[in-house]
Regions:
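Carbohydrate transferase catalytic cores enriched for Leloir-type hexosyltransferases
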Residues: 1-414
Length: 414
């Protein structure tokens, strides 16, 4: 059996890359224990212009008797000539950057993580971000003695130009809106092709936006990310700022992926600034926001996996004001340690997190403030236990779904 496996998803470290990485290692482990495994080859489809971000998964580093590599730069005709039995496309959105994948002739299992651009377009989230995202109408300059000074741009012309640039970057002028069209063309190429997605919400979103038949979409929850044994034993952060924060033992609410505007960090920070006036012993910690907006706001740089693990483990609670999620890894990362979750109530969040979090509308600062005020030491244990319980339930489903997904990939093997 010849399996073509998507390594294009690994060009940067994100949720889709973690997904593909986890499925790859689960598949490889299964193959190693199959009878007549010497008849199976896993060929990793990579792009020599955008190599995997994971060092151990680079073509020169991943040496295994069942694994080889093929470069997409060689052309689809050469790839089709190898007569692969199945192509596992770990992030179908990447077909937008590689439209030639629509010409593959083998059976394909396509993973649609979400319909983010379609959701943005249909619900005017682009416009919301353009007006509310991370200080997009604020310029930064260096003043006397290196002090950073911020000011509003008053000129309507400049404000309009900034808005126009922003909405173009967010797809309202069609950039990004057609990211899934090439993947859909590949999907429709063969009757036995199938779409896999990561939540029932995403399944229904695909059906709504693309008129795909329900029985052609299979829901398999995103598998738990890979944790190294080194991370389990890690007790000291390598980032000095995080280390000082942990050693101080202050209560902090954690917000991750703060550089991504869809995570809605600015609005949550506005709510937390008011909250900190009523709860004097708490801080909010963002990862990758790029600035600190008030005294109780601590911004960390992008963290290594082990440091992020410790940041989750040491936080008081996770604050997750995201405007869109197809699945939602970060809350589960925190729930692993029994941390209470304050989460937006949109998209897949209620499905994945069930009744464990304190929910709020991400559109209202007062709603976020209300959620913050709803958690205190008197009910902390209650929400902590609910997080731990829900994490275990989802983890079991993740394990079962991952095993079933590997079965799907190996379906042609006998």
């Amino acid at each position: 059996m010849k399996i073509l496996f998507d390594f294009l998803a690994l060009y940067q470290k994100n949720g889709a890359a973690e997904y593909a990485r986890r499925v790859f290692y689960a598949l490889l482990e299964r193959v190693e224990h199959l009878p007549n495994a010497e008849n199976i080859t896993i060929t990793c489809l990579f792009d020599s212009h955008h190599l995997p971000a994971y060092t151990e998964m680079l073509p020169d580093n991943l040496c295994h008797k069942y694994v080889d590599f093929v470069d997409i730069q060689n052309g689809i005709s050469e790839i089709n000539a190898q007569n692969y039995d199945v192509f596992f496309f770990g992030c179908a959105q990447n077909a937008g950057w590689n439209p030639q994948l629509a010409e593959l002739t083998c059976k394909s299992i396509l993973v649609f993580h979400d319909c983010v651009w379609e959701e943005f377009y249909n619900n005017d989230i682009n416009l919301y971000l353009a007006h509310n995202a991370n200080d997009m109408f604020h310029y930064r300059a260096t003043g006397p003695r290196g002090k950073k000074i911020y000011w509003d741009i008053k000129s309507p012309t400049i404000r309009f130009c900034r808005w126009l640039l922003h909405v173009r970057q967010h797809g309202i002028l069609e950039e990004g809106y057609n990211m899934l069209q090439s993947a859909l063309a590949l999907f429709h190429k063969r009757e036995d092709n199938i779409i896999v997605t990561v939540s029932n919400y995403s399944k229904n979103s695909i059906m709504y936006n693309f008129d795909v038949k329900e029985d052609k979409i299979c829901v398999k929850y995103s598998p738990e990310r890979i944790y190294s044994n080194k991370m389990y034993g890690m007790k000291r952060a390598t980032d000095e700022k995080l280390l000082r924060l942990i050693n101080s033992q202050v209560k902090y609410y954690l917000m991750v992926s703060a550089n991504r505007q869809v995570k809605n960090i600015k609005k949550a920070l506005c709510a937390f600034k008011v909250f900190a006036k009523y709860r004097l012993d708490v801080f909010v910690v963002t990862v990758g926001y790029g600035m600190e907006l008030f005294d109780k706001h601590v911004d960390l740089p992008f963290l290594t996996d082990s440091d992020l693990y410790l940041a989750y483990k040491s936080c008081y609670a996770l604050l997750y004001p995201s405007l869109f999620e197809g699945f939602g890894y970060p809350p589960l990362e925190a729930m692993r340690f029994g941390k209470p979750i304050l989460s937006s109530n949109v998209c897949s969040m209620p499905e994945i997190l069930a009744d464990a979090p304190i929910y709020f509308s991400p559109l209202y600062e007062s709603a976020i403030f209300n959620a913050l005020m709803s958690l205190d030491d008197s009910n902390y244990s209650y929400y902590s236990k609910k997080s731990a319980k829900q994490y275990e339930e989802i983890r079991k489903k993740q394990e079962d779904d991952l095993s079933e997904l590997v079965d799907m990939i190996l379906n042609e093997y006998s």
